Amino acid sequence: NMKKLSVLILIAALFSVSFGQTMPKGADPQLWARALQIHRKAIVIDGHNDIPTPMFEQDYDLATPSTGKFHDDGDPFHSDLSRFKASGITGEFFSIYVSGDLFKTGGAMRRAMDLIDVTYRATEKYPGQLIQCTTAADIRLAKKRGKMCVLMGIEGGYAIENSLGALREFYRLGVRYMTLTHNVTHDWADAHNDTPKNNGLSDFGKEVVREMNRLGMFIDISHVSEKVMNDVLDVSKAPIIASHSSARALSDHTRNVSDAVL
C-alpha cells in the first residue's frame, strides 16, 4: 500500500549520518549519540541513486569499493555494499534513468528494461545484503532482518512511450515512482529547462497521473516545469514526491521547488 509507504518512509536524497562515522569536531556528544540512536531506529530511504547506470554501462559490481570510481560523466561513485552497510540506510531507490536522447532517437523503453534487469541481478547476486522491496511491509521486514531494500524509480516519463499499458507493466516489475520528465520536454510533459509544448501536462499526461494514483505509484516532480508541478497537484489524489530536488528559495535554480508549490 503506497499510501502507507508514503507515511512510513523518510525521503533523504543526501543523508550524512552513518554508523561508522566518527563524531564531527565540536559536536555535542549527547546530541550526536541521540542522532545515531534515532537513525538506527528509523526507516530511512534515499530517494534517488544513479548507480544502475554504471552497473549496466561499466559492468560495475556493488561488491567493489566505490572510492576512486567515476561515472562516465566524471562524477564519483558513492555506492557499494560496504557503504550501504555503514550508512545504516534502510533502502535506496535505484534510478532507472533514461536519457532524453533516447526519447529523440528511440529505445527509451528498452533502456529502462535493461536497468531494471541489472538491478534485479544485483539483488539476486547479493541476497545476504540486499532485498528487492515494493511495499511498506517489505521495507519493515528488511529493516528487521538487517538487509537494505532495493526499490526502483523511473527517471524520464518518456520511458513508457505514451502507453498506459507500459506504465502498468513497469509497476508489475516493481517500479514504485516515475519522474515525469528528465531534462527534455516530451509528448505529454514539459521539463524545467526545455521549451514547453504542452502548457504543463497534456491531457494524456493527466491520464498518466491518474493511472499512477490508481496503481499506487509515486508521482515525482523533480526535473519538471513549475506548470507541470501545479498540474500534478491539481490532478493527483495521492501524495507526490520530489525525489532529488531542493528548495528554490535556498538555491535559485529551475530544478528546485518554489515556496508557492511547497
Model segments located where?
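Sec-dependent N-terminal signal peptides
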Residues: 5-14
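N-terminal hydrophobic targeting/anchoring segments and the immediately downstream early-domain regions
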Residues: 19-197, 252-262
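Histidine-centered catalytic micro-motifs
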Residues: 44-51, 224, 242-245
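Acidic, glycine-rich active-site loops and adjacent beta-strand->loop/helix elements
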Residues: 98, 246-247
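Short, catalytically relevant binding-site loops at active-site mouths
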Residues: 226-227, 247-249
